[in-house]
A protein has these predicted regions:
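Catalytic Walker B motif of ABC-type/P-loop ATPase nucleotide-binding domains
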Residues: 176-179
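ABC ATPase NBD Q-loop/coupling interface
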Residues: 68-91
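Short coil-to-helix segment of the ABC ATPase nucleotide-binding domain corresponding to the Q-loop/switch region
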Residues: 110-118
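ABC ATPase C-loop
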Residues: 168-169
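Conserved ABC ATPase signature
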Residues: 151-155, 159
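Conserved catalytic motifs of ABC-family nucleotide-binding domains
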Residues: 172
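Helix-to-loop junction immediately C-terminal to a conserved catalytic motif
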Residues: 59
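Conserved ABC ATPase "signature" region
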Residues: 129-146
Length: 231
C-alpha cells in the first residue's frame, strides 16, 4: 500500500426496515477510493447521499454489507477493518483513529475538562499534564473557563461541537474522521477549527471529512470525493 493509509474497495451499505413489510434501501454502493498518509480528503454531496453512513462504516460504528476497508495500522499492519475482531477495532480507535460525530454523547456527570483530557490520560499522559492541555485546547476553541467543570449536556449546540472537536484532536490521532464538524459553528469558531485541522495535517495526521461549506473545502482539501445519492 506504500503511503496509502486507507483503501476502500467496492463498499456497500444497505438497511432493512419492516414497515410492516420488509423494505431494503442502500445508503451507498460500489464506493472505491484510496486515502494517502498526511492527506486531507473531503467528501461532498447532497443531503441523504450516504456520506455520514460511509464515515460510520470507516469507524466501524456501522458494519458494511459488502466490500473491504484496508487500513494500515501501526500496531497490526494492513488489516481489513470490516473483518477485524471487535477488541482490535477498539484498540485502533483508542490509539490511532479518532472521530468527530455530528452529535456529542456524554455521561452527564463528566465535565467538559475531564472529557477532553481523557484521551491523553488513556495514553498514559500524567493526569495533571492532561488537564492542563485540555484547558489550553478548550480555551483555544473559545469555551468559557466557567464551563470547564460543567457537563457538556448543558452547553449550546456550538459549544458541544467544539468540545467534541477538542476531545478528538487533542491527542493528534493518525487518522481523523470528521462528520460536518463546523456545521453548528459561527464563522469565528470555524476559522479556529480550520487552523487546528491544517496544523494536524502538517504534523502528519491524515484527515477525511464531510463538509458542506464549499469555500472551506477548497481551502483545506487535497482531494474531494463527490458522493451521488442512490436512487
Amino acid at each position: 500500500m506504500n503511503n496509502i493509509i486507507l483503501q476502500v474497495e467496492n463498499l456497500e451499505k444497505k438497511f432493512e426496515l419492516y414497515l410492516p413489510e420488509k423494505k431494503v434501501f442502500f445508503a451507498f454502493q460500489n464506493i472505491n477510493f484510496n486515502l494517502y498518509q498526511g492527506e486531507f480528503f473531503s467528501i461532498s454531496g447532497p443531503s441523504g447521499s450516504g456520506k455520514s453512513s460511509l464515515l460510520k462504516c470507516l469507524y466501524r460504528t456501522y458494519k458494511t454489507t459488502k466490500g473491504s476497508i484496508f487500513y494500515r495500522s501501526s500496531r497490526y499492519g494492513i488489516v481489513d477493518f470490516t473483518k477485524l475482531q471487535e477488541q482490535s477495532v477498539l484498540n485502533i480507535r483508542s490509539n490511532e483513529m479518532s472521530y468527530v460525530s455530528q452529535f456529542l454523547n456524554v455521561i452527564p456527570r463528566i465535565s467538559a475538562l475531564n472529557l477532553v483530557a481523557e484521551p491523553l490520560i488513556r495514553k498514559n499522559i500524567p493526569q495533571g499534564i492532561a488537564i492542563e492541555r485540555a484547558k489550553e485546547m478548550l480555551s483555544r476553541l473559545n469555551i468559557p473557563t466557567n464551563l470547564f467543570d460543567s457537563s457538556p449536556l448543558t452547553f449550546s449546540g456550538g459549544e458541544k461541537q467544539r468540545v467534541n472537536i477538542a476531545r478528538a484532536v487533542i491527542w493528534n490521532p493518525s487518522l481523523l474522521l470528521l462528520d460536518e464538524p463546523t456545521a453548528s459553528l459561527d464563522e469565528k469558531s470555524e476559522k479556529i477549527v480550520k487552523k487546528i485541522l491544517v496544523t494536524m495535517k502538517k504534523s502528519g495526521s491524515t484527515l477525511i471529512g464531510i463538509f458542506h461549506n464549499k469555500k472551506l473545502i477548497n481551502q483545506i482539501s487535497d482531494r474531494v470525493f463527490l458522493f451521488r445519492k442512490e436512487e
